[in-house]
Swiss-Prot record:
It comes from Pseudomonas putida (strain ATCC 47054 / DSM 6125 / CFBP 8728 / NCIMB 11950 / KT2440). InterPro entries: Ribosomal_uS8, Ribosomal_uS8_CS, Ribosomal_uS8_sf. The keyword rRNA-binding applies. Keywords: Ribonucleoprotein, Ribosomal protein, RNA-binding, rRNA-binding. SUPFAM superfamilies: Ribosomal protein S8. The keyword Thylakoid does not apply. PROSITE patterns: RIBOSOMAL_S8. The gene is rpsH. One of the primary rRNA binding proteins, it binds directly to 16S rRNA central domain where it helps coordinate assembly of the platform of the 30S subunit. GO terms for biological process: translation. This is Small ribosomal subunit protein uS8. GO terms for molecular function: rRNA binding; structural constituent of ribosome. Pfam families: Ribosomal_S8.
């Protein structure tokens, strides 16, 4: 059976690995998943990521913990295949009063809501992280 929403699968794998206190989680790689992993690393939510393999690339994400607790408290999919959420730059959501981030897919690439506001572009709100 084919995977309907690969990004939701990625977020679920990260959540499950953190609940099981794993240090690394692996999944099939895609351009979008690598872009989201890059944003998570830049924002300090994960320790690192690596793409391995040529024929079937695999994405390995190194999870981050602080004092035994996962750094990511909440990881939710916003836009989904059945109901896409596109927001203008003025309507981009703030997560928990600006403490968290929304990851947005824009015509200038995948970035945080803060970077999208600074660039003056809106786009599809992929997920929220806190």
């Amino acid at each position: 059976m084919s995977m309907q929403d690969p990004l939701a699968d990625m977020l679920t794998r990260i959540r499950n690995a953190q609940m099981a206190e794993k240090s690394v989680v692996s999944m099939p790689s895609s351009t979008l998943k690598v872009a989201v992993a890059k944003v998570l690393k830049d924002e300090g939510y994960i320790a690192g990521y690596q793409v391995t393999g040529e024929a079937k690339p695999s994405l390995s994400i190194e999870l981050k913990y602080f004092e035994g607790r996962p750094v990511i408290e909440e990881l939710k999919r916003s836009s989904r295949p059945g109901l896409r959420q596109y927001k203008a730059v003025t309507d981009l959501p703030k997560v928990r009063g600006g403490l968290g981030v929304s990851i947005v897919s824009t015509n200038k690439g995948v970035m945080t809501d803060r970077a999208a506001r600074a660039a003056g572009v809106g786009g599809e709100v992929l997920c929220t992280v806190f």
